[in-house]
């Protein structure tokens, strides 16, 4: 099928209209035992002009066989078009914390919920054969041995026909970052919720004709509203209960998020203020979470169109409570009343710490690789960015036992901070 599709794509420009399925793969990605691989690489793209009408991704071994989620988890992948400006970001910060030297447009993403792109008939995401695609990835290896895999992506590609062009619109609680995380404190009590939101003003009129969303463990819903007329546009709800990878290296996310694909879509007008709200359970901490919605926008006049919304498909479900264990017991003497520790490669300098309530504690990053400080369990949720140099501070205002780890090296780097 792949060979036939490629031959069709290489046909002369006068060829009949066709929609072909193209299967492509990333370069090999090696992940250490119980490790996390993050990075950015250039990937292949269709070699002739056309339109992407659908897209999906998965993880395969070097022989092309699908890899189970319980073995290597596709935590998330983002496909970008290099040298194209993004609709909501003027600059993009990579995993290294540095701004991208080139503009990139985020046009498709997939996480644990395995969202696939499917545009309505008559619409397409324009692509030139000369366009450059990139892949931003985060994969997790749940086995005690190194593994090498590829990200496989399947593109349905229309050529030889004129489709209405769509523009990807990425909305995010922490926009313009490769790792757009925040943490839920978990201090609200039983049945409580925690919400963050972000606003974006539309620079032009048109309609959203497709969209999907990405939440992490503890998520309740992502809701898009148009504050200019006060109405709801789309609510994406999670489904829980998938296969549980072991060991549990992070709080499991939903196995599905509701999406929409419809024409003529959801009309919005130039100057409208869109608000994306991410709602999480606040009865327990949830760290390194995200709140993202990617929409596909068809610009044009919406005169005469009334506001509309995607019907709700249910109500938010309370996510299952998952207590994240420490995968390595912290070692060494108990360090009392200290205010800082070094974080080197694969080790916290002081792994067992006891401090009085109200202490502001500092982690100093001094390794050759990136690491972070993330709460596994404890009274209040927090997490640092991934850092190679610099420091991170947290003020401990609630007594209790804080079990901490590095989310990039969860079986190697752990720490317990007891707050008196």
Language-model features, listed with the residues they occupy:
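Bacterial N-terminal signal peptides
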Residues: 1-11
């Amino acid at each position: 099928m792949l060979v036939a599709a490629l031959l069709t794509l290489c046909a002369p420009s006068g060829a009949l209209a066709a929609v072909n399925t193209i299967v492509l793969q990333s370069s090999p990605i090696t992940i250490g035992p119980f490790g996390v691989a993050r990075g950015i690489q250039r990937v292949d793209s269709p070699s002739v002009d056309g339109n992407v009408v659908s897209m999906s991704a998965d993880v395969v071994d070097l022989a092309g066989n699908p890899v189970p989620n319980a073995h290597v988890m596709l935590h998330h992948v983002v496909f970008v078009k290099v040298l194209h400006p993004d609709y909501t970001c003027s600059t993009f910060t990579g995993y290294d914390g540095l701004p991208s030297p080139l503009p990139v447009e985020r046009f498709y993403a997939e996480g644990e919920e395995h969202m696939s792109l499917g545009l309505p008939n008559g619409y397409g995401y324009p692509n030139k054969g000369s366009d450059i695609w990139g892949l931003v990835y985060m994969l997790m290896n749940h086995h005690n041995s190194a593994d090498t895999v590829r990200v496989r992506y399947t593109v349905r590609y229309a050529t030889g026909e004129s489709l209405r062009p769509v523009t990807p619109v990425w909305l995010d609680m922490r926009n313009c970052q490769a790792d757009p995380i925040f943490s839920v404190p978990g201090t609200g009590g039983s049945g409580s919720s925690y919400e963050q939101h972000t606003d974006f003003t539309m620079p032009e009129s048109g309609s959203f004709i497709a969209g999907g969303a990405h939440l992490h463990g503890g998520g309740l819903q992502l809701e898009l509203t148009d504050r200019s007329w006060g109405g709801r546009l789309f609510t994406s709800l999670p489904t829980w209960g998938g296969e549980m990878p072991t060991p549990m290296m992070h709080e499991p996310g939903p196995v599905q998020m509701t999406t929409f694909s419809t024409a003529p879509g959801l009309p919005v007008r130039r100057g409208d203020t869109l608000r994306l709200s991410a709602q999480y359970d606040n009865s327990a901490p949830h760290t390194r979470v995200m709140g993202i919605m990617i929409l596909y926008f068809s610009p044009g006049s919406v005169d005469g169109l009334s506001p509309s919304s995607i019907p709700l498909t249910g109500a938010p479900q309370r996510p299952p409570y998952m207590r994240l264990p420490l995968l390595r017991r912290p070692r060494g003497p108990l360090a009392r009343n200290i205010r800082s520790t070094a974080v080197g490669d694969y080790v916290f300098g002081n792994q067992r710490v006891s401090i009085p309530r109200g202490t502001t504690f500092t982690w100093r990053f001094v390794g050759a690789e990136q690491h972070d400080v993330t709460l596994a369990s404890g009274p209040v949720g927090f997490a640092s960015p991934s850092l190679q140099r610099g420091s991170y501070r947290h003020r401990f205002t609630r007594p209790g036992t804080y079990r901490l780890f590095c989310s990039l090296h969860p079986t190697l780097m752990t720490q317990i901070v007891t707050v008196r």
